[in-house]
Design a protein with these regions (language model features):
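Aromatic-lined carbohydrate-binding surfaces of glycoside hydrolases
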Residues: 1-147, 154-163, 236-241
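Intrinsically disordered, low-complexity boundary segments flanking structured domains
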Residues: 53-54, 114-115, 179-184, 256-259
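Residue-level recognition of short, well-ordered coil/turn positions
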Residues: 63, 191, 290-294
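Catalytic domains of carbohydrate-active enzymes that cleave complex glycans
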Residues: 79-81, 89, 93-157, 227, ...
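Catalytic-core region of carbohydrate-active enzymes that cleave or remodel glycosidic bonds
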Residues: 167-251
Length: 330
């Protein structure tokens, strides 16, 4: 798993702070990597044992550039903790507007920050959210930012968040809402701007029935539009019978995974790796061609074909094949 993850040039790990941040989007529920306990005297205690083991394991395989921690704004706004007084799990159901929410997260993040600093991980840690409302993001940002945390979001474009998010991954096509000035300002501050696809995108995508070239097209789309990369929201969220049926609830077949149990890859996953490697080669060639206007113009012409996401699978194959010939010759 980690070897394949590394071959896809993954540089960030996703950690889970509270139980089940994504609700019904996954077949298997996610336990927290930080164990939160409310002591009998009303104070909070946190056990980072699992979190530490996970981050250290990822780092062994080179997945150590960024740690995205989910989520201050989970899908059901329900936070589970162990209650010593009742000797049972209890839940806080709340909203981002309440004092209860602010108290819960201020306590959690203060302790978490101290632990991250001790481990040397604070600067590369983001508090991450997934497709949350602008108002909730701003409320959460106030709390996290006051303690010096950086924040990440995979979701819709919001102008109010452009200068705030360290890692802003927008839905495919919403990247067109960024102005060139916004993208330049984010890049100057070392902020990351990427795109993602999900069940809302018919094509291009990496469903079971998508043409393989679509997976290669997506990272090249990011390269053509001056973005830092491409994210698919899930790659091993298996359903009940992942080897025989890739459908899951409302999601398109294969949307929740492209890598299979038993260390089995897929054509679409391998074509995605191909696209990621081509993205990296494009970045290298852009630097090399600064003093070679002829080759620079050729590369830019080929990339122009990837600037629009309004394509079908057959178009993706044609565009990918054309740029592959050029990249393989360089």
């Amino acid at each position: 798993w980690f070897v394949e993850h590394d071959s896809a040039d993954s540089t960030l790990s996703g950690a889970i702070m509270f139980y089940e941040p994504w609700g019904e989007q996954t077949h298997d529920l996610f336990d927290p990597m930080v164990q939160t306990t409310k002591k009998a005297n009303g104070t909070w205690a946190y056990d980072y044992t699992i979190f530490d083991k996970y981050v250290e394991l990822c780092a062994e395989y080179g997945i150590d550039k960024q740690i995205n921690c989910f989520s201050m704004v989970p899908w059901d706004m329900n936070f589970r903790y162990w209650d010593e007084a009742s000797v049972s799990f209890q839940y806080i159901q709340t909203t981002t507007k309440t004092d209860e929410y602010r108290e819960l997260w201020t306590n959690f993040l203060k302790a978490f920050k101290a632990h991250l600093i001790e481990k040397g991980w604070f600067e590369k840690t983001n508090i991450a959210m997934d497709e949350r409302a602008e108002s909730d993001m701003l409320n959460a940002y106030q709390i996290a930012n006051a303690l010096g945390f950086k924040m990440a979001l995979a979701g819709n474009y919001h102008a109010s968040l452009c200068d705030k998010l360290q890692d802003f991954c927008v839905a495919l096509g919403q990247d067109k809402k960024f102005t060139s000035e916004q993208l330049a300002a984010r890049r100057a501050k070392g902020q990351v701007t990427t795109i993602y696809t999900s069940c809302a995108d018919v094509e291009p995508n990496i469903y079971s029935n998508s043409l393989p070239a679509e997976a290669t097209f997506l990272p090249l789309y990011a390269a053509a539009n001056g973005l830092d990369g491409y994210l698919h929201w899930a790659w091993i969220n298996w359903d009940e019978h992942p080897l025989t049926d890739s459908r899951f609830r409302k999601f398109g077949a294969g949307d929740t995974y492209c890598y299979y149990p038993g260390n089995r890859s897929s054509v679409r996953f391998e074509r995605l790796i191909e696209g990621i490697h081509q993205y990296e080669k494009v970045q290298i060639l852009k630097e090399e061609y600064k003093d070679n206007p002829e080759k620079k113009a050729k590369l830019e012409t080929l990339l122009d074909a990837f600037k629009s996401h309004a394509v079908v699978g057959e178009d993706c194959a044609e565009k990918v094949n054309a740029i592959e010939v050029f990249l393989n010759e360089e």
